[in-house]
């Protein structure tokens, strides 16, 4: 296989939405799961129905890259994921309760909470669209398709993909 076509994990973003008192618990949860310090996320728009205004802290997130991201993903993945949780170059899935993760124990100061996991994939050469000088687009033949994303996850993490109509 051409080394430039090899797919790798770019980053994993763990995200937990919460307001006020629950936000502090969400920060502790993400710190407990990853060992990294989470960043608070702020609302951009006003949504009166949910009592949200611009600048209000509405959640937290943490980004993990490199070898630590691969190790964390192996811990977080369940045996089965749905096909609709995959896209071209990414995969998203929820962790409903952190106590479902085998290596983590219940923490009374956190309680029962869950979070979302977003996995971004890349190939060698993807940095050409992010650099400051001589930026260029990634050609369509080099982009990662949904099918390639599913195949990568099957091969590297031994998961089963459920299609529409099958149950978890």
Q: What are the roles of these predicted feature ranges?
A:
Residues 1-168:
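Ribosome-associated RNA-binding proteins
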């Amino acid at each position: 296989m051409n080394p430039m076509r090899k797919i790798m994990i770019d980053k994993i973003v763990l995200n937990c939405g919460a307001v006020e008192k629950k936000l502090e618990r969400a920060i502790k949860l993400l710190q407990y799961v990853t060992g990294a310090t989470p960043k608070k996320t702020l609302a951009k728009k006003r949504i009166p129905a949910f009592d949200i205004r611009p600048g209000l802290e509405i959640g937290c997130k943490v980004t993990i890259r490199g070898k630590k991201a691969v190790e964390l993903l192996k811990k977080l993945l369940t045996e089965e994921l749905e096909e609709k949780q995959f896209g071209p170059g990414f995969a998203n899935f929820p962790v409903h309760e952190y106590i479902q993760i085998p290596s983590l124990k219940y923490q009374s100061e956190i309680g029962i909470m869950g979070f979302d996991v977003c996995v971004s994939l890349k190939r060698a050469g993807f940095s050409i669209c992010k650099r400051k000088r001589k930026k260029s687009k990634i050609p369509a033949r080099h982009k990662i398709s949904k099918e390639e994303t599913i195949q990568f996850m099957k091969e590297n993490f031994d998961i089963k993909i459920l299609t529409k109509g099958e149950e978890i």
